[in-house]
Swiss-Prot record:
Record's GO cellular component terms: cytosolic large ribosomal subunit
Keyword Electron transport: no
Transmembrane segments: none
Subunit structure: Part of the 50S ribosomal subunit; part of the 5S rRNA/L5/L18/L25 subcomplex. Contacts the 5S rRNA. Binds to the 5S rRNA independently of L5 and L18.
Protein name per UniProt: Large ribosomal subunit protein bL25
UniProt region (Disordered), positions on chain: 179-212
Any one Gene Ontology BP term: translation
Any Pfam family: Ribosomal_TL5_C
Listed GO MF terms: 5S rRNA binding; structural constituent of ribosome
Job description of the protein: This is one of the proteins that binds to the 5S RNA in the ribosome where it forms part of the central protuberance.
InterPro entries: Rbsml_bL25/Gln-tRNA_synth_N, Ribosomal_bL25/Gln-tRNA_synth, Ribosomal_bL25_b-dom, Ribosomal_bL25_C, Ribosomal_bL25_long, Ribosomal_L25_dom, Ribosomal_uL5_bac-type
SUPFAM superfamilies reported for this sequence: Ribosomal protein L25-like
Gene name as annotated: rplY
Length: 212
């Protein structure tokens, strides 16, 4: 597999909301590392490093976090983003071991177009999988090209990535191909349309004026 990304972490010495805000102003993101029967470790990393990691490797990224000269294999477990800027305000990491299997939610996307006159409805955005920590897929892509109205893709129909096991309910509906609903006109528009139809009918029924 490709070489893991390595990010330098610094142990935190100050805590609380004020300290976290100061870190973010200085271009740092506070993190907490959990797992493997260790006490939580509070660190901070460069904002650009973490943003690049998540952008390039996804929300389940696995990487080497160096703390005080020691590399720790970790994966992103949860991200807290600013609701306005979408910048990462905080993240939780899970300390893992090579060869360990973990449960992760993997994003699901679809590509292609259904049959003419059909519309695709995606009911779930993620599927829960059990997979080797170093083989976590960034996403699952479903091909919906040419699917007809009434066809569905359930979780059990999704081809699993190598060595991955489906944990989500096998009968969970992922993709549903439906007939588009007719758009209803607002009441005012309907009344106007009916008035126009009635006026057109009256004009058609009116006798033509005789010419002298």
């Amino acid at each position: 597999m490709a070489e893991l990304t390595r990010i330098e972490g610094v142990l935190r010495t100050e805590f609380g909301k004020g300290a976290s805000r100061r870190l973010r102003r200085d271009g740092r993101i506070p993190l907490v590392v959990y797992g493997n029967e260790l006490d939580p470790v509070h660190v901070h990393v460069d904002t650009l490093d973490l943003h690049a990691l998540v952008r390039n490797e996804g929300v389940n990224a696995v990487f080497e976090l160096n703390i005080d000269g020691e590399d720790n294999l970790v994966m992103v477990k949860a991200i807290d983003q600013n609701v306005l800027t979408l910048d990462i305000d905080h993240a939780d990491l899970l300390n893992v071991k090579r060869g360990e299997r973990v449960e992760v939610e993997v994003p699901v996307i679809h590509e292609g177009l259904p049959a003419p006159g059909a519309m695709v409805v995606q009911d779930v955005d993620v599927l829960l999988l059990e997979v080797d920590v170093l083989d976590i897929p960034e996403e699952i892509v479903l091909d919906i090209n040419g699917l007809e109205i009434g066809e569905q893709i359930l979780a059990k129909d999704v081809k699993m990535p190598s060595n991955a096991v489906l944990v989500s309910d096998a009968e969970e509906l992922v993709i549903n191909i439906v007939e588009p609903e007719e758009e209803e006109l607002p009441e005012d528009d309907e009344a106007a349309a009916e008035g126009e139809d009635a006026a057109a009918g009256e004009e058609a029924e009116a006798p033509a004026e005789s010419e002298d």
